[in-house]
């Protein structure tokens, strides 16, 4: 299957899942997770209409961003991996979105390092919704406090929440985690009515339907678009 065919298949699924959830298809954005994938694969996806790409590794992502900028191809780049404080400058200078914000210290650095001639960096707070020791993200109880920090940083724009629940094939368990995220998302909107909080990034290939049922506005899909991972 070509990347174009894979994207068509995913868009058909998005159409089905949004209809079942009584939501317009336009309510859900597809983020193509392109980590470890070559520029040729990203170009193929772009030529098939894909504009938003997610990268987990800072330097690899920056190399790709610079490659496509040199080709004059305008893509939207999301950083979706864990971020160490010594790598914040590269994210602040090159990416459009940062989806894994979990510390005020990182927010302050991103704000200071965001170039003045660029639009504010769109950020999502990562919630550790399944309370896994191995996963990044904050506890739900810490959300409002971190959001208040972000609100005061002029070069960041708080757009919503992101989560990676513990993987499970049990639909009820998937929906329990995602519906908890949906409630937190609504709380965030109420608490910050003047912020453009419109993005709930959750759902991957195997739990996309549950995520969309529970209000996801962005699903992150890698293998189903690009095939098995290339190391």
Task: Label every model-predicted segment.
Residues 1-187, 191-206, 212-214, 226:
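Conserved alpha/beta-domain cores
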Residues 216-231:
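Gly/Pro- and small hydrophobic-enriched strand-loop and loop-to-helix capping segments
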